[in-house]
Curated annotation (Swiss-Prot):
HAMAP family: Ribosomal_uS12_B
Function, as annotated: With S4 and S5 plays an important role in translational accuracy. Interacts with and stabilizes bases of the 16S rRNA that are involved in tRNA selection in the A site and with the mRNA backbone. Located at the interface of the 30S and 50S subunits, it traverses the body of the 30S subunit contacting proteins on the other side and probably holding the rRNA structure together. The combined cluster of proteins S8, S12 and S17 appears to hold together the shoulder and platform of the 30S subunit.
Assembly information from the UniProt record: Part of the 30S ribosomal subunit. Contacts proteins S8 and S17. May interact with IF1 in the 30S initiation complex.
Protein encoded by which gene: rpsL
Native organism taxonomy: Bacteria, Bacillati, Bacillota, Clostridia, Eubacteriales
Keyword flag ATP-binding: no
Gene Ontology cellular-component annotations: small ribosomal subunit
Residues that bear 3-methylthioaspartic acid: D89
Record-given protein name: Small ribosomal subunit protein uS12
Entry keywords, A to Z: Methylation, Ribonucleoprotein, Ribosomal protein, RNA-binding, rRNA-binding, tRNA-binding
Amino acid sequence: MPTISQLVRKGRKTAVVKSTAPALKECPQKRGVCTVVKTTTPKKPNSALRKIARVRLTNGFEVTAYIGGVGHNLQEHSVVLIRGGRVKDLPGVRYHIVRGALDCAGVANRLQGRSKYGAKRPKKK
């Protein structure tokens, strides 16, 4: 335990918190252009074909982002908005593509959790 005079001389070091989404540079979202759109398989206990895109951001970073929801309309040169948030069973995927923003369409026929997938409220019959 330090003495008071040692604390006056040096002070306490604050622990540096490492960012989970460094490519965003403290921004809530960033715009980018898809360079590759493909599927990949998840880690060991899970099995699927997860849709991902390699995105070149406006700040020069190139990141891998997950495309959530059922079906998508993305291809190379699509302009997308990405947010932070990793995918636990895909190593290296630390970003999500925002559905319903820029070139990425919302999920069709989505009735629950619509705001997370950019789906409009369905018309009443």
